[in-house]
Curated annotation (Swiss-Prot):
Gene Ontology MF, one: hydrolase activity, acting on carbon-nitrogen (but not peptide) bonds
InterPro entries on file: Amidohydro_3, Formylmethanofuran_DH_asu, Metal-dep_hydrolase_composite, Metal_Hydrolase, Metallo-dep_Hydrolases_sf, Metallo-hydrolase_FwdA/FmdA
Protein family according to the UniProt entry: Belongs to the metallo-dependent hydrolases superfamily. FwdA/FmdA family.
Annotated organism of origin: Methanocaldococcus jannaschii (strain ATCC 43067 / DSM 2661 / JAL-1 / JCM 10045 / NBRC 100440) (Methanococcus jannaschii)
Protein name per UniProt: Protein FwdA
One Pfam family named in its UniProt record: Amidohydro_3
Matching Gene3D superfamilies: Metal-dependent hydrolases (3.20.20.140), Urease, subunit C, domain 1 (2.30.40.10)
Upper classification of the organism: Archaea, Methanobacteriati, Methanobacteriota, Methanomada group, Methanococci
NCBIfam families linked to this entry: FMH_DH_FwdA, one_C_dehyd_A
Length: 567
């Protein structure tokens, strides 16, 4: 199928295109120089054209997501999705799989990264990926509390750890190294936690600092497309900004060396809003977002996503088990907890971010401060879906960023006065333009994930994942901005029109992306002996039953990396 998108106002930061009126040609799922006279015309006059959106951190599939669905029937009743010719769906903060795919597609998103996959339960994640239409997917396995990783890093054996990581990524069809509360979730298995970068992990004699730096070195030795993806210790605690800065600093000097992609950073700090808290308790709680932003701006190795609080009732879920228990003790709502053998653990707790709550108002302001004070090449839009709010609120966040008037309407009329008193968001006059919105929703993601060869831009050879929005580039009405980005005029996925006038008109199933790194054969064989012994002694499954087989995807996209020099 051939298309020509005519007269659109194009925003494509990876190619330096900032609001130019131009035509985009599509053929056989790719963007091309030209098409035949038989090409179908999409009239984008007066509309904005961007690459398909990319969500670099979201919880959309797998065990804890399904727990969130099961134990929150009240959430499933909040929003029912019934469209002629499509699958129905339910759920507001934890939507069902089909609804997840449809709603991302409505907003112009075409690629989503599942942010935390327990390796032992990876098959569950991939099963749900197969039932999530409209988007390409990838999942990040959890490594920061894995017994094998802790032991190799304690011994200082970076090469063996790298071989283990390479084996696990291929075995569970994973994309990147995810680290959550390094050492703390393992400690939670004993009813404990770690509270600083230098607290030893019980029974392993290794510290979070050594885990984070060690895995950063492993990542760059392997040359993975994405950097380490880090949820630091002490999430959600007053005063944690110091831990956040120390964690960022602990990988200084670890140079980005991707063998695939154009990534320049070696450290990705996710949901940074939850890690930018000042004060010593909730009584003197305050923002330290500007201090975090200042460090990020001057540090080549760091990039952040925000995790913007949207002031909704939502469902929190994370592999930071002790944090979820603390949350449960704070709000008294129901709590689910799970330990995943030698690998990780997690928790799920409902949460209500009331705009009239003083702490929640400051959390809201902290996220906006990060957006408004961080270099737009180094910040990415997320809500840590569903933890700070559902992904369907991205359009509202975009409206807050583009319109100071809309932002101030919330600041002065809807949220608690602490947002004014304990942050600097009221002082921020900055308003994002559409070029910057394109950066923080697609271009930056493509680059830091190592996918920018074919994703996140509209150059010739790129995948024809395209979003068209009915919005004037000069628009400052927050509600109009929000509506335009919530329901795209057109969306193309793989060169096919899948959304028209905000409605899904065609169901497609994207690829599941994973990394296959080949290291030296002798080194891998030695590591597999260790792996086999661990499975025999400790795991509840046999090693032969552990890997995810090829049947668990609609279609795989494999990023192959030759790292056989590691031996």
């Amino acid at each position: 199928m051939e298309y020509i998108i005519k007269n659109g106002i194009v925003y494509d930061p990876l190619n330096g295109i900032n609001g130019e009126k131009m035509d985009i040609c599509v053929k056989d799922g790719k963007i091309v120089e030209s098409v035949s006279d038989n090409a179908k015309v999409i009239d984008a006059s007066g509309c904005v054209v961007m690459p398909g959106g990319i969500d670099s951190h979201s919880h959309v599939a797998g065990a804890k997501v399904n727990v969130g669905r099961i134990f929150r029937p009240e959430d499933s009743k909040r929003e029912i999705y019934a469209k002629k010719g499509l699958r129905t769906g339910t759920g507001f903060s934890v939507p069902s799989t089909y609804k997840t795919g449809y709603q991302y597609s409505e907003m112009g998103y075409t690629t989503v990264i599942e942010a935390a996959m327990p390796p032992l339960i990876a098959r569950h994640t991939h099963e749900e990926f197969m039932e999530t239409p409209q988007i390409d997917k990838a999942a990040m396995p959890l490594f920061g509390n894995n017994w094998m990783v802790l032991e190799y890093l304690k011994e200082g054996d970076i090469k063996a750890c790298a071989a283990f990581v390479a084996w696990l990524l291929k075995a569970v069809k994973g994309f990147a190294i995810k680290i959550v509360n390094p050492g703390g979730t393992e400690a939670w298995g004993w009813g404990k936690n770690v509270h600083s970068l230098d607290d030893p992990v019980p029974y392993f004699d290794i510290t979070p600092r050594e885990i984070v730096r060690g895995l950063a070195e492993v990542n760059e030795l392997l040359g993975l497309p994405h950097s380490i993806h880090v949820h630091p210790n002490n999430l959600g605690h007053p005063g944690n900004w110091e831990t956040t800065l120390e964690t960022m600093k602990c990988v200084e000097g670890v140079e980005a060396k991707p063998r695939v992609g154009e990534r320049e950073t070696s450290y990705y700090n996710t949901h940074c809003q939850f890690h930018s808290y000042g004060g010593t308790s909730w009584k003197d709680f305050e923002s330290k977002a500007i201090e975090i932003a200042e460090y990020v701006n001057k540090s080549k190795h760091v990039v952040i996503d925000v995790g913007q609080v949207t002031l909704d009732e939502t469902t929190t879920m994370t592999a930071d088990g002790p944090m979820e228990y603390d949350l449960h003790m704070t709000n008294g709502l129901k709590w689910a907890n799970c330990d995943v053998e030698l690998e990780t653990g997690s928790g799920v707790v409902p949460f209500i971010y009331s705009p009239k709550g003083p702490v929640y108002a400051v959390q809201w302001a902290i996220g906006l401060e990060l957006f408004l004070n961080t270099n737009t090449d180094k910040v990415l839009l997320t809500t840590d879906h569903p933890n700070a709010g559902p992904f369907t609120r991205y359009p509202r966040v975009i409206a807050w960023l583009m319109s100071k008037k809309y932002r101030d309407e919330w600041l002065y009329n809807k949220v608690h006065k602490w947002a004014q008193q304990r942050s600097h968001v009221a002082d921020a006059d900055k308003e994002y333009d559409l070029y910057e919105i394109a950066k923080i929703t697609r271009a930056n993601q493509a680059k830091v994930l190592g996918l920018s060869e074919t994703k996140g831009h509209l150059g010739v050879g790129a995948e024809a994942d395209i979003a068209i929005y009915a919005i004037d580039p000069e628009e400052k009405d927050g509600k109009k901005i929000e509506k335009a980005f919530r329901y795209a005029k057109y969306v193309l996925k793989g060169g096919e029109v899948v959304v028209k006038d905000g409605n899904v008109v065609k169901e497609v199933f994207g690829d599941t992306i994973y990394v296959d790194v080949q290291v030296g054969e002798d080194l891998m064989n030695e590591v597999l002996k260790d792996v086999g012994e661990k499975f025999r002694r400790y795991y509840s499954v046999n090693l032969e039953n552990y890997p995810v087989s090829d049947e668990y995807a609609n279609s795989w996209r494999v990023i192959k990396i030759d790292a056989t020099d590691i031996n």
